[in-house]
Design a protein with these regions (language model features):
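Short, structured secondary-structure elements
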Residues: 1, 7-274, 280-286, 293
Length: 293
């Protein structure tokens, strides 16, 4: 780590530098930053795309689907100078936008029933994860608040009894008039996955999902062409060491008969649950649902 220090180097790919670089319109601060980077690299942006190209790209980006033939004809025939911005606003209001970007965010954050730490309700948990994000995308909740709801999520509150926690959660599983899961302030399943139990796994997942950075190499060694050292990784990993998600029982509840272990043992004995028999899992799930109602 101490012997190698990466130095960022920009190497232009053309002679379009300085005064030779053409004027490029940038209507927003983001565009200005992009153009500044392109100017440094000597890359001239592509020409403005055609209406047909724009409509196809914006539909795929925002809704994951292609425009209908009638929509294409109407858009191309329009003479309005604002038709592109209006089309973007229109697509952002479509249900397909919320569905498509919820799917993307679930993918980025690792929503996978097979990795959720509950063999009985993992499919329900994956669905609740999706619904929690979908509601926020649909109602235009800012991304920083969505990220906060995932990163700072809690399940059982400090000092909350298991009985009170179990009663509150059971309302989401009722057959009639269940409480929508998206009404919860936070979504705790991000930290409930089986593949993020260790602090280093949490660090890798967080860096990829929320920072867009892959730091696997720094976990073992200093990469000669990357800025992250193994020491950086260990410091970053330390942030995630206090985070835990497990069915632990506080000392005050041990022996009370009202904790996770004792309640699950009671239900398993009632249905004759055997982990080796798959059909027992369905009976166990049905019994838990029955008690929730």
């Amino acid at each position: 780590d101490n012997g190698i220090q990466p130095v960022p180097v920009y190497r232009p790919v053309s002679d379009k530098l300085g005064d030779a670089y053409p004027e490029v319109a940038a209507t927003s601060e983001v565009d200005q930053l992009i153009v500044a980077k392109l100017r440094t690299l000597g890359i001239v942006p592509s020409e403005k795309c055609t209406d047909e190209e724009f409509l196809r790209r914006v539909n795929l980006d925002l809704t994951g689907s292609l425009p209908l033939p009638g929509e294409i004809r109407s858009f191309v025939a329009s003479k309005s100078p604002l038709k592109r911005s209006k089309k973007i606003d229109e697509l952002l209001k479509r249900p397909a936008y919320a569905a498509w970007w919820t799917t993307k965010l679930c993918d980025y954050t690792g929503n996978n029933a097979q990795n959720l730490n509950d063999p009985v309700f993992r499919n329900d948990m994956a669905r609740q994860w999706y619904e929690w994000i979908y509601h926020r995308v649909k109602t235009n909740v800012p991304y920083d608040q969505i990220a906060e709801g995932l990163i700072m999520a809690t399940s059982r509150q400090k000092g909350e009894s298991f009985r009170h926690f179990a009663t509150g959660m059971s309302h989401h599983y009722k057959k009639e008039n269940p409480v929508p899961f998206h009404t919860r302030k936070s979504m705790p399943f991000y930290w409930a996955r089986r593949n993020v139990r260790k602090p280093e796994e949490k660090a890798l997942s967080f860096a990829h999902a929320f920072l867009g950075v892959r730091i696997q190499c720094a976990q073992c060694h200093k990469h000669p062409f990357d800025q992250w050292t193994q020491q950086d990784f260990k410091k970053f990993q330390a942030f995630f060491e206090p985070i835990q998600y497990k069915a632990n029982t506080p000392r005050s509840e041990k022996g009370s008969g009202m904790n996770y272990q004792s309640l699950m043992k009671e239900i398993e004995q009632f249905v004759g649950y055997d982990k080796k028999k798959k059909n027992n899992r369905k009976q166990l799930r049905e019994e838990i649902r029955k008690r929730a109602n």
